């Protein structure tokens, strides 16, 4: 099968997409996976490093207020729709999976309009604008938190999946991690992170 995966801008969209891609590869060695992102997004560095085929579209985030940037973003959106159509026609995916971020908007939308099975995954309790818009067109909306269900208008499409996690996080060698980070296992450690 051919899988087109898209999502980007931040690690919060990219790493779950890569987790999904890697799990597909683990379960189906013959799967063909294409990741679509933007040239300027973090995905342009991370995806090729993971060994996946990577293509780009032209698209920018839509400003919340109407201004000069809104018109530039609209132009880029139309270019992104055209780029997405071309990539979909060339790759011929069996399924398209989006993990959020403005880049997945044109890709998932074009795939849905071509009647290709489409899924989106929302990693946050409060869904992003792109996924809320796309939920109208896709076949399934996968959510991490039950609380986010109330923000989507199509409850029949929702599947609670949790958040995809990279195997290297799950299968970590704790002793080696302490050594690599030069941390004593006998000293309390506080980790703080966020997005």
What are these regions (language model features)?
Residues 3-7, 30-81, 161-164:
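Conserved nucleotide-sugar phosphate-binding/catalytic loop shared by glycosyltransferases and other
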Residues 1, 173-192:
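Nucleotide-sugar donor-binding and catalytic loop/hinge architecture
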Residues 5, 34, 42, 53, ...:
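Active-site-proximal region of nucleotide-activated glycan assembly enzymes
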Residues 12, 47, 100, 125, ...:
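Residue-level signature of catalytic and energy-coupling elements of molecular machines
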Residues 72-89, 172-176:
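Glycine-rich, highly charged phosphate/nucleotide-binding loops
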Residues 7-10, 99-101, 192-195:
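Glycine-rich beta-strand-to-loop/alpha-helix junction loops that act as flexible
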Residues 83-96, 104-119, 132-136, 140:
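Glycosyltransferases and closely related glycan-assembly transferases
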Residues 13-24:
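Short amphipathic alpha-helix
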């Amino acid at each position: 099968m051919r899988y087109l995966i898209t999502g980007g801008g931040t690690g919060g969209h990219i790493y779950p997409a890569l987790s999904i891609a890697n799990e597909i590869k683990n379960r189906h060695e013959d799967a063909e996976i294409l990741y679509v992102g933007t040239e300027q997004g973090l995905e342009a560095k991370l995806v090729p490093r993971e060994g996946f085929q990577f293509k780009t579209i032209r698209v920018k985030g839509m400003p919340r207020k109407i201004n000069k940037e809104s018109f530039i973003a609209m132009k880029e959106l139309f270019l992104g729709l055209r780029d997405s159509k071309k990539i979909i026609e060339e790759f011929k995916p069996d399924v398209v999976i989006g993990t959020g971020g403005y880049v997945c908007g044109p890709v998932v939308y074009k795939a849905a309009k071509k009647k290709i099975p489409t899924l989106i995954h929302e990693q946050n309790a409060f869904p992003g604008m792109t996924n809320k818009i796309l939920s109208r067109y896709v076949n399934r909306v996968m959510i991490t938190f039950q609380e986010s269900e109330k923000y989507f208008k199509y409850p029949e499409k929702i599947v609670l999946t949790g958040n995809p996690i990279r195997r290297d996080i799950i299968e970590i060698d704790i002793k080696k991690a302490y050594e690599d980070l030069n941390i004593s296992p006998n000293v309390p450690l506080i980790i703080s992170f966020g997005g």
